[in-house]
Amino acid sequence: MSPEASAAASLPVPDPTLTVERLLASAAALRPRLREQQDESDRRGYYSPEVHQALMDMGAYRILQPRRFGGYELGCEAYVRTVLEISRGHPASGWCFALAGSHAYMLAAHWPPEVQGELFGPRGDFRAAMTAGAGGTWQRVEGGYRVSGLFPFASGIPVSTHFMGTGVVPQPAGPPRLMHFIVCREQLSIEPDWGGDDSMGMQGSGSNSVRLTHAFVPDRYLVPADVMLSSEHLPEGTHGTRLHGNPLYLGIMLGWFSCEFGAILTGTAHAAVDEFTQLLRTRKMTFNPQLERKHEPHSQGTLGEALSRTEAAEALTFAATRLYEAQCARFGREGKPITKADTLQVWSISREACRAACEAVEMLFRAAGASVAKRGARLQRYFRDVQMYRIHIQSQPLFPQMKGLLALDMPLPPPFG
């Protein structure tokens, strides 16, 4: 046992008999409730307390949490499958859940054992929204910093116990450094700037802004933000690999985050296929109202094309997730780090999954007819939801450019170089 492992106490898991199969069945069983509450959740800006409690009860928030701190440590594929199921019921709820529930993994990988013990706490209850964009004004004080500022798009914050942020932090010696930090819920306020017409899509994703006002961040709650692309600078692994004895807690984040988006978008595409299929079975043909639209060859072809792209998106999402897990396992076996090229390979596969899923939703929306333009139409909601990915940084040209730069043996731009 490593010194780090011996320094941290263990917590019992809530349900020692939980299996991935039972977890996924519970997530799928939520689908009718999530669909019934879509309008309400979008107006509120996040899912209902009843859904939150159901996710707590089924153990969904603890999938990636290490066993030492009361989690199930079921792995990344179990997580993306759960995210997909929830997103199939309501894409915005899938986004909210995914980005509140996954950062226990980041905590378990990169913060020291004593901090993990403090933040997981005596019950192992930890959920954190995160923003990657650097922000805040930082003042050095005894033992840490006081930080103030507005951190927008903190998806999942209404159901979170903590907030992870990113800042350019002054250093006692040398230039400021890009770092991640954690604050507890009691030190922040949530701005009422999400839900309803505050956004075009993903209205129930809980992507409110977080405001910090002289929040205290102890030095030990700060870690360098150099774990997005590569573990090449971590030959001995991370706090997490040593503490938990699991190479999955290498925690290289950019590739992994892209897998989550693949799951959200694939779930959205499945939801759109479900809705379009129901429409074809119940709506009449415009010029032959004696027949349902399911007899219309063009609609049959559109459904088949969209379903094919949805199935491709699902296969690519799972392939990217398994590739990331294999890269972590390789480190455990051979000590071989995850390189920048490795991470961008995972990211690029996930991006193609997201692209295929978006195209599936968009073609179904275009083929559905004018009725889906009305407020409350599910296909309209799904169309608006995928546009939120289309404008997200994950879909922008920066990452293909970096992949091209590596192929040309050219340096990456800051802060990735």
Predicted regions: what is each one?
Residues 368-417:
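Glycine-rich phosphate/cofactor-binding loops in nucleotide/flavin-utilizing enzymes
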Residues 150-196:
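DPxDG-like acidic metal-binding loop motif
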Residues 209-310:
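Glycine-rich beta->alpha junctions and the first turn(s) of the following alpha-helix
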Residues 35, 39-42, 312-352, 365-368:
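C-terminal helix-coil-helix/basic helical segment that borders enzyme active sites and/or dimer interfaces
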Residues 1-25, 29, 416-417:
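Basic/polar N-terminal segments that are highly enriched at the extreme N-terminus
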Residues 51-54, 113, 289-297, 326-345, ...:
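Charge-rich, acidic-biased intrinsically disordered regions
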Residues 47-57, 62-161, 173-176:
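Glycine-rich flavin
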Residues 25-28, 267-270, 304-311, 347, ...:
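Generic structural signal for well-ordered, non-transmembrane alpha-helical segments
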